[in-house]
């Protein structure tokens, strides 16, 4: 009787442990499944195709993730101007600043809005026009072998936590699919020093890397 009682009393604890393990595993799988890559598309991102891209050089591996910031007009958010800019649909007459970038044709693979929503403009298999004249570890033309992520923001304002959360999830997904990205993440200012300053002093690299590490190893 004592053995039977002890065996019975152990079961609820064992069941509780199993439930916790299944919950943790299920939560992790749900997080991992939030973004997936299929044929160069980021599933879970809103697709807004940009005409500003070309083919990567043949046999080029994706090996660098570049983080930028952008706001149109500078330090003002919302309005959809970034999306219009990347699609060559921006009305240059709307704001005086737009006239200073009139005719420019640029893009990024991804844009993370202040709300944390992720937009994809260029397929990862293609070469987005985000880096310009650039070099990383003595290798020039970073557009050839990188993925560019724009954060809606500016050098003089903090980013939103929702943007860090989305960036962490997207980065983890990209690193899983493109293993070389695990060791190679840079800011635009790192690959174009003296020419570019983004993502700027308000981008918290330490917090981003710590959150990414915790997300990948909960």
Region annotations inferred by a language model:
Residues 8-28:
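Short, Lys/Arg-enriched N-terminal segments with co-localized hydrophobic residues
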Residues 10-15, 72, 115, 154, ...:
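Residue-level marker of positions within ordered structural domains that often coincide
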Residues 23-140:
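N-terminal catalytic cores of peptidoglycan-degrading enzymes
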Residues 30-41, 140-145, 154-218:
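Basic/polar, cationic surfaces and motifs that engage anionic cell-wall
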Residues 149:
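Conserved, mostly hydrophobic/aromatic
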């Amino acid at each position: 009787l004592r053995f039977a009682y002890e065996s019975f009393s152990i079961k609820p604890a064992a069941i509780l442990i199993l439930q916790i393990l299944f919950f943790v595993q299920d939560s992790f799988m749900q997080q991992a499944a939030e973004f997936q890559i299929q044929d160069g598309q980021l599933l879970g991102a809103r697709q807004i195709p940009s005409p500003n891209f070309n083919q990567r050089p043949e046999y080029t591996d994706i090996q660098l993730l570049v983080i930028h910031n952008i706001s149109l007009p500078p330090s003002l958010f919302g309005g959809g101007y970034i999306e219009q800019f990347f699609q060559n649909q921006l009305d240059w007459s709307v704001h005086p600043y737009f006239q200073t970038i009139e005719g420019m044709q640029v893009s990024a693979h991804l844009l993370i809005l202040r709300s944390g929503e992720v937009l994809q403009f260029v397929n990862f298999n293609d070469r987005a026009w985000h880096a310009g004249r650039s070099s990383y570890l003595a290798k020039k033309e970073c557009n050839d072998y990188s993925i560019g992520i724009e954060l809606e923001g500016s050098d003089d304002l903090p980013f939103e936590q929702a943007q860090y959360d989305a960036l962490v999830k997207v980065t983890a997904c990209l690193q899983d699919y493109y293993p070389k990205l695990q060791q190679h993440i840079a800011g635009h200012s790192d690959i174009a020093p003296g020419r570019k300053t983004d993502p700027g002093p308000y981008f918290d690299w330490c917090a981003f890397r710590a959150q990414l590490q915790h997300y990948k190893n909960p």
